[in-house]
From Swiss-Prot:
It is found in: Nucleus. Histone demethylase that specifically demethylates 'Lys-36' of histone H3, thereby playing a central role in histone code. InterPro entries: JHD, JHDM1_Histone_Demethylase, JmjC_dom, Zinc_finger_PHD-type_CS, Znf_FYVE_PHD, Znf_PHD, Znf_RING/FYVE/PHD. This is JmjC domain-containing histone demethylation protein 1. Binds 1 Fe(2+) ion per subunit. Residues 1-45, 117-212, 408-440, 744-795, 837-860 are annotated as: Disordered. GO terms for cellular component: nucleus. Belongs to the JHDM1 histone demethylase family. Gene3D superfamilies: Cupin, Zinc/RING finger domain, C3HC4 (zinc finger). A zinc finger (PHD-type) spans 23-116. The keyword Zinc-finger applies. Residues 416-579 form the JmjC domain. PROSITE patterns: JMJC (PS51184), ZF_PHD_1 (PS01359). The gene is JHD1.
Length: 860
């Protein structure tokens, strides 16, 4: 909704009837009426003679008097840019509120919309704060002169009558942008009067005109944030000139054949060398010192990774033909970082007209970074690296349409449900080397094409950028890892390592619109490193890396995002950063929470069968890699916290419903039980390896020690430990009624009665007010007749108020053997208050307020 201004005319206009109609009030002046300028009494005018200017909120489309905003309280006056307020007050004084300063506004938002945009209860907050803007960077003298002129009206005294006084904003014609809506109003009315030859028109235009202004499109802001691009391009071209330092990354290139899941899991335990490549530890991908992995053509190129790309002569026009010429795509204007929708054919024609062999190159630089190509002819020519397909959560855990027998295609060939003699399926097992590995992979791809249910499509992207394109600092959604191969052209990456401090700095930077506009992120982190990629180069960006991208020449790139089980902690951390910085849902990893439940359900099933008794088994299944187990502990804690929201009666209903809707109920029947079962099963395996942290509880941590073997087998020594293990086995062999067995006792059901208050008049001796007497026993608890001086004291009339509060609570639970236990508690609270009136003798002077005594008694 673009900013709108205009002037309203009533049904019976002064020109038509000669009767002056009071102006319509806005939401701010409905009770008091429109404000009057100071000069109205001097000139003998009334409110009917004043030209009230209207302005509409770009968010809710509510109309307001500009004068009411200018004269309103701080909340409403604060919605106007400060420069406009100061200019109006300086040049127009007290009459400034009635001038046409609205002409200087670019965008404006009302106070309720501003408050809602920053409210924690808003389920879909804007990506950037709502801020009123101006048309120009500064207000020119001609703008000030124009604002002081009266609004132009039609010169005709026989203006056609309007059918009603309802305001209906009129959209400006395509390509038309008027500087003065009042002039536009006049010309339209005159043209209509000429066309009707003075006859009153039944369909006369109604309401205020609407000025067409540029709209900010917030799509793709996960990868691109609106910034003054030119200054960053100048900075990266010559960092020393601006006092900055950008280091060459010098990340060593790796052989493509090394990058497999087997290499990722080649380190048996922390601190031990890799069994595949002792010099290249897999922690380079998932450890705290992880860094981008680069494969150059001389190291085997993309094909050595098990991937496949289209032929080298692929052009943007070919991409349009293979994906679909009419396919809509978001095209980003690099100079403003605003995006618009183009067809791929229009994009291809623009690139063709801007190619280097043409005499005149288009000055506008555009960038396409969000073209997902799954299910297209182009997708058949692109195959992600093998390591991506092996560990990608979507490929390995998402439940696509069920195949024959109600099983997912990834479950084919496993035999009956007992799994006797079969190994536990790990990530990527559908791609295991063997006779049917390729067949299962083809089945999975075919299932993706045929499925009617949505799933996260983020693994196949085609990125096309023009020379000079810039994508500002970002972390890919949910800290997902990225594979990135240059088909043609070149790219320059700027990296910031995802350390704890750097992630905090990034969260601060990305959560502030002002910092994104004028702060180089490199000033807030420890260092920035640069990597240059050329045609044929491939790079895998690890989890959570903060990066920006520059395009030195026209380029076509293929890449994709993937989540995995080796950095779940960082993935969950970035999910929270996205929530804290109010990233809209459409810019986050699609269906992330649902995917987490699928992962948990599969791993929990695998761990359950890992310990199952198989009398005819010929092989011994191996537990997941220690790094996967460590990350599953983070996943389990996250899911436990999600189920905690579901069971929290004090949580907002909206939050509880959000968690509930993201749980795949067809697969996960007992979310709390699944989360907690996964937690203790993971802790048991970590305990067996001797890797259970102090923060994780579990009896297995104290009883099982690892012998350090690669497969994590366990050797137990000592009779005492053996006896404990035997006792535990009897417990775990017993079938529980529910997986939530004995996790938490049931909550108390409380019943609190209303207070019972009784007031009576009694005869009691007045107690002493001295502290020494109170200690010695004087007072209500002392013997009757004891006075302050130890002598007898007469009874006096007093008012005794007794309040009794009774509270009971009860809970009941049933054990596995059918035993029912009921517990109840009862508490009685008694408060007594005794009041003696003022004395009528000489002591009344020293104690004019009387005496109040309270006595509390709690009876359990």
């Amino acid at each position: 909704m673009s900013e709108q201004v205009g002037q309203r005319e009533a049904v019976d206009s002064p020109q038509a009837t000669g009767v002056k109609t009071p102006p319509e009030p806005c939401p701010l002046c409905r009770e008091t009426g429109p404000p009057q300028p100071p000069s109205i009494t001097e000139e003998g005018k009334t409110n009917e003679d004043i030209d009230f200017i209207w302005v509409a909120c770009n968010k809710c489309d509510e109309w307001y008097h500009s004068a009411c905003l200018f004269l309103g309280d701080e909340k409403w006056r604060g919605t106007i840019p400060k420069e406009i307020i100061s200019t109006v007050e300086t040049n127009f004084g007290d009459e400034g509120a009635w001038t046409n300063w609205v002409e200087w506004i670019g965008k404006w938002y009302c106070a309720p919309c501003l408050a809602r945009s920053t409210s924690p209860s808003n389920p879909r907050p804007p990506r950037h704060p709502l801020v009123a803007t101006m048309k120009r960077a500064s207000i020119q003298p001609k703008d000030i002169d124009q604002a002081g002129k009266p609004l132009k009206r039609s010169a005709s005294t026989s203006a056609p009558l309007l059918k009603s006084n309802i305001k209906r904003p009129r959209t400006s014609t395509k390509g038309q942008e008027t500087a003065s809506p009042e002039i536009d109003m006049k010309s339209e009315r005159e043209q209509q009067a000429e066309s009707t030859a003075g006859t009153p028109a039944s369909d006369a235009p109604q309401g205020r005109p609407k000025r067409k202004t540029a709209q900010i499109d917030y799509r793709n802001l996960n990868n691109s944030i609106a910034t003054p691009t030119h200054q960053w391009l100048e900075l990266i071209a010559d960092p020393e000139k601006y006092g900055r330092t950008i280091l060459d990354a010098n990340y060593p290139a790796l052989p493509g054949k090394l990058l497999t899941r087997a290499w990722l899991e080649s380190q048996p335990l922390p601190g031990q060398p890799s069994s595949i490549s002792p010099d290249l530890l897999p922690t380079r991908f998932w450890g705290p010192d992880r860094e981008p992995l680069i494969v150059r053509p001389e190291n085997g190129g993309f094909s050595s990774l098990g991937g496949h790309l289209p032929s080298k002569d692929l052009t943007v026009q070919d991409v349009a033909n293979l994906v679909g010429p009419d396919r809509m795509v978001d095209v980003i204007d690099v100079s403003s970082q605003h995006s618009s929708q183009w067809t791929l054919q229009k994009w291809a024609e623009y690139i063709q007209s801007s190619s280097g062999n043409t005499s005149v190159r288009n000055p506008k630089v555009y960038n396409v970074i969000s073209l997902e190509i799954s299910g297209t002819e182009l997708a058949k020519k692109v195959k992600p690296p093998k390591i991506v397909r092996e560990i990608d959560w979507v490929d390995n855990f998402w439940r696509f349409n069920a195949g024959a027998g109600g099983k997912d295609v990834k479950e084919k060939g496993r035999g009956n449900d007992s799994r006797e003699g079969s190994e536990i399926r790990k990530e990527g097992s559908h791609l295991t080397e063997g006779d049917n590995g390729g067949e299962i992979e083809e089945d999975l791809e075919g299932l993706k094409e045929k499925t009617n249910t949505p799933y996260p499509k983020v693994q196949l992207y085609c990125l096309m950028g023009m020379k000079g394109a810039w994508t500002d600092w970002h972390v890919d959604f949910a800290a997902s890892s990225v594979y990135y191969t240059i088909h043609s052209g070149a790219k320059v990456f700027f990296f910031v390592k995802p350390t704890e401090q750097n992630l905090k700095a990034y969260a601060e930077w990305s959560g502030s619109y002002e910092k994104q506009q004028d702060t180089w992120l490199g000033d807030m982190v420890d260092e920035v490193r640069k990597v240059e990629l050329h045609a044929g180069d491939t790079m895998i960006i690890p989890t959570g890396y903060i990066h920006a991208v520059y395009t030195p020449m026209d380029s076509i790139v293929f890449g994709g995002n993937f989540l995995h089980s080796y950095n779940v902690d960082t993935q969950l951390r970035l999910r929270q950063i996205e929530i804290d910085t109010k990233v809209p849902q459409r810019f986050r990893f699609p269906m992330f929470d649902r995917l987490c439940w699928y992962v948990a359900e599969k791993y929990c099933s695998d761990l359950r069968h890992l310990r199952a008794y198989r009398p005819r088994a010929t092989t011994t299944p191996k537990p997941p890699h220690f790094r996967v187990l460590q990350c599953l502990s983070y996943l389990a804690n996250f899911l436990v916290s999600q189920t905690g929201i579901l069971e929290d009666p004090e949580a907002e209903d909206k939050a509880r419903k959000l968690v509930h809707d993201r749980i795949p109920g067809d697969i996960v029947k007992d979310p709390e039980g699944l989360a907690k079962e996964l937690k203790w099963r993971v802790e048991r395996e970590l305990g067996a390896l001797g890797l259970l942290g102090e923060e994780a509880s579990g009896v297995e941590a104290e009883e099982f020690k690892s012998n350090g073997t690669a497969n994590g087998s366990v050797k137990i020594k000592g009779k005492e430990v053996s006896r404990k293990r035997d006792r535990l086995s009897k417990v775990f062999d017993k079938k529980a009624i529910s997986r939530t067995w004995d996790f938490h006792p049931p909550a108390w059901s409380e019943n609190r009665q209303s207070p019972q208050i009784e007031t009576t008049t009694v005869q009691l001796p007045r107690p002493s007010t001295s502290s020494s007497d109170a200690i010695s026993g004087s007072g209500p608890g002392a013997s009757p007749g004891a006075s302050a001086n130890g002598g007898a004291n007469e009874n006096e009339q007093a008012e005794l108020t007794t309040m009794l509060v009774k509270q009971t609570r009860k809970r009941m639970r049933e054990l596995d053997d059918g035993t029912v236990i009921e517990e109840s508690q009862e508490t009685t609270f008694v408060e007594k208050k005794t009041i003696w009136g003022p004395k009528l003798d000489k002591e009344k002077i020293s104690q004019p307020q009387g005496k109040v005594e309270e006595d509390m008694d709690i009876d359990h």
